[in-house]
Amino acid sequence: MIVIVTGMPGSGKSRIVEEFEKRGFPSVSLGDIVREETVKRGLELTKENVAKVSIRLRQELGQNAVAKLAVGKVRVLLEKSPLVVIDGVRSLDEVGTFRGAFPEEKIIIVAVHTPPRLRFERLKARGRHDDPQTWEDFEERDWKELRFGIGGVIAMADHMLINDGSKEEYEKKVKTLVEKIIRGLNRGGA
């Protein structure tokens, strides 16, 4: 089984990935693949360079470039684990790449929705080097994500978590969903 986790930046995707990892299931981050490719190309890991490499990869290999690069890693992990989580899928082309590469695997899409203002505040507080510090930067980043096609992936989700309350409420939702998916794995569904 493959679980694809998607959502806008700052929505709470990584918390879902962490919950699966805590239970022994491995993950592949498409963002990490772009960062690795940036380093391979001899570039410094800056927001601008990572964005340029992401665009260049898609120009060189197609809109599903990052997914194509991830397929080998996912395949290796599926040999050792009945469930692999893929974090950061941003387009239906990427979903299609995984469906095509793994026709024998059940693929579940989990999307997280968090209101924009709340995501902006969380990203500012998180303070990662590539997190926006102004509302204008935040909106620009959101529009880039939407142009990549993330809205289509969110719309096709099998499960949608709404993250608009307290941290404790979201934790409970995440654990409940992860348990449901794992139970489905053991029964052949979800």
Swiss-Prot record:
Protein name in UniProt: UPF0200 protein TGAM_0868
UniProt cross-references to Gene3D superfamilies, sorted A to Z: P-loop containing nucleotide triphosphate hydrolases (3.40.50.300)
Entry-linked SUPFAM superfamilies: P-loop containing nucleoside triphosphate hydrolases
Residues binding ATP: G7, M8, P9, G10, S11, G12, K13, S14
InterPro entries according to UniProt: NTP_hydrolase-rel, P-loop_NTPase
Organism from which the protein derives: Thermococcus gammatolerans (strain DSM 15229 / JCM 11827 / EJ3)
Claim: Transferase is one of the keywords in the record: no
Family as reported in the entry's similarity comment: Belongs to the UPF0200 family.
GO molecular function terms listed in the Swiss-Prot or TrEMBL record: ATP binding
